[in-house]
C-alpha cells in the first residue's frame, strides 16, 4: 500500500488489503455523471453488494474535500449522487489542483486506477473504458484511460470501450502501448451496449481463475501497465445493434453540431443516447455494470488464492 499523505483508505478496505483478501475498486464518475439521481446511488450500492456477495470487499473511489478516498460510506455515495454533474469529473490532470483546493472530484477510469493502485487494490470493475473518439484523427480526442492502462498495473473489468467511440482505433492504440485486451468467454470485442463489434480481442479467457493467472504472470514478469478484460453484456440485456448504432450516430452528429468537446463529450453522448433509446440504454448500462462487478469480485478472489 502506498502511504500517500493525501490518501484515506476505508478501514474495511485497509484490513482486507493487509490480510491479503480480495478488494475490487469502483469508479465514481458513473455516480456523478453516468446516471441520474436516485438511480445512480441505488446502482452504486447494489454494485457494492454484488461484490460482497461474490467474496470481495468493494472500494468505491472518489476525491472528497481534497482527500483521495479508497472506500466510501453510503452517506458519501449519496452526497456524490445528489451533487451529480456539479462534481468535477477528475482525470489525472485534475488531481493536483483538486487536492490543493480541497475540492471534490468524481474519479474516471484513469484516476480510479491510480488511487486503487495506491491503496493496494489490483482489480477494478467499471462499465466501459474511454478511448479514441470518432474523428480523433483531426481532434486528437483520446481518453487518458488508455495511457493509464499502459502505465498502472491494475486489471480493469469492463464491457468493452463505450460504443460511442472509434473501437478500431482504440484497439490499435492499446496494442501500440502493449496493453493486453482479453475477452471473457468471447474472441470478439464487446461494444458496451451490445455483445458484438466486428473487432477481435487478443485472447479469449473462460474462467476467473484463468484471468487471475494471466494477471499474476503479468505482475511477476514486471510488465508495466494493466490488463483490460472485456466482459460482454448478458444476452438478455443487450441492445439491438442497429438501434443503438443509429442512436449513437445521431448523438455524435448533435455533439458536433453543438461544438461539444473534451471531458463534456462522453456525458453528453450517453445522455443523448439514453434520450434517443427511450431509456433502454440506461437499463443496459446498469446491468452490464452488475455483470462486471460479479466477474471482478470472482477474479479478485482467485488472484488472492495465487498469493
Q: What does each of the following model-derived ranges do?
A:
Residues 1-20:
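N- or domain-start disorder-to-order transition segments that initiate the globular core
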Residues 15-18, 23-24, 53, 115-118, ...:
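Solvent-exposed alpha-helices and their adjacent loops that cap or buttress functional pockets
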Residues 24-26, 58-63, 105, 123-128, ...:
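General beta-strand structural signal in soluble alpha/beta enzymes
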Residues 28, 33-35, 41-98, 220-236:
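Glycine-rich nucleotide/cofactor/substrate-binding loop typically near the N-terminus or early
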Residues 38-44, 76-81, 131-150, 173:
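A glycine- and small-aliphatic-rich helix-loop capping segment at beta-alpha/alpha-beta transitions
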Residues 106-109, 137-150, 154-175, 209-213:
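Active-site glycine-rich loop that binds ribose-phosphate moieties when present
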Residues 195-220:
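Anionic-ligand binding region
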Residues 223-291:
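A C-terminal functional module that forms or caps the active site or interfaces directly
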